[in-house]
A protein has these predicted regions:
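Alpha-helical protein-protein interaction modules
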Residues: 93-97, 101-111, 115-238
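Acidic, proline/glycine-rich low-complexity intrinsically disordered segments
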Residues: 1-108, 112-123, 128-129, 135-137, ...
């Protein structure tokens, strides 16, 4: 149910997991999936509360899940995502690696761990895992297309400074989010082919209000201040 990307589906999933926990407080996966669903709902504006409140609630759920079953790869996969959201990058990598060591063929694990690796400097390894996730599961559960997988690949190519490859992958995305929109036009600027009259460029300016850019940048979860500054400088020129 939490894979139905609607407010109703999210609420139903939370109620389902609460009932599962009520029936069996030691159900590790119920705690883990509740954390995932809370994060999804908050990120999309369906669950209220501050960012700090959400980190606390989801973190408590995941910590409880790991306490109950430290050998559950789902728990480590989700805990990696929680730490990434909190910009705790080394902890994100640690739990991502644990999930990967347990189930190295799960595309969700490959994708999540790959995202962390490229951010933390293991760019080639992370990019390889992101490519494998796309190959194994091009349309993730709950999605209608491969935009998520392609957008993840853009992150890897961005860190690798494979700007030509980045632009080619971006052509396969049906609807760009802020991350893909920013990366592709940043790449074009680096190659001196940026056209500010381009339709997709103008659509991004209309869709993503400038006042929200600092928040959007923060949600890219980029550890390196130098890279954050480069992206901020690029945005300031447009």
């Amino acid at each position: 149910m939490h894979h139905r990307f609607t407010p109703e589906g999210n609420q139903q999933a939370l109620e389902f997991f609460d009932k599962a926990i009520e029936a069996d407080a030691n159900n590790a996966q119920a705690h883990a999936w509740k954390a995932c669903t809370l994060g999804q709902g908050w990120f999309r504006g369906w669950v209220g509360g501050t960012q700090e409140d959400m980190f606390q609630m989801s973190g408590d759920c995941i910590a409880r899940a790991v306490d109950l079953n430290e050998n559950d790869f789902e728990c480590h996969r989700m805990l990696s995502a929680v730490h990434l959201s909190k910009h705790e990058f080394q902890l994100a990598e640690e739990h991502g690696r644990k999930a990967y060591d347990m189930v190295p063929s799960d595309p969700r694990v490959l994708s999540g761990y790959g995202e962390v690796l490229v951010r933390n400097g293991s760019v080639d390894e992370g990019l390889d895992l992101l490519g494998k996730a796309l190959e194994l599961d091009p349309v993730p559960q709950g999605q209608l297309n491969s935009d998520k997988r392609f957008t993840d690949l853009l992150l890897g190519h961005f860190y690798a400074e494979n700007f030509e490859d980045l632009i080619e992958v971006a052509k396969k995305i049906e609807h760009q989010n802020f991350q893909s929109w920013l990366f592709v036009h940043y790449a074009k600027q680096q190659l001196n082919v940026l056209n500010k009259d381009d339709k997709s460029f103008e659509q991004g300016l209309q869709e993503y209000a400038k006042d929200d850019w600092p928040l959007f940048l923060d949600r890219l979860h980029i550890p390196q201040e130098e890279i954050r500054n480069k992206l901020s400088e690029f945005l300031s020129t447009i």
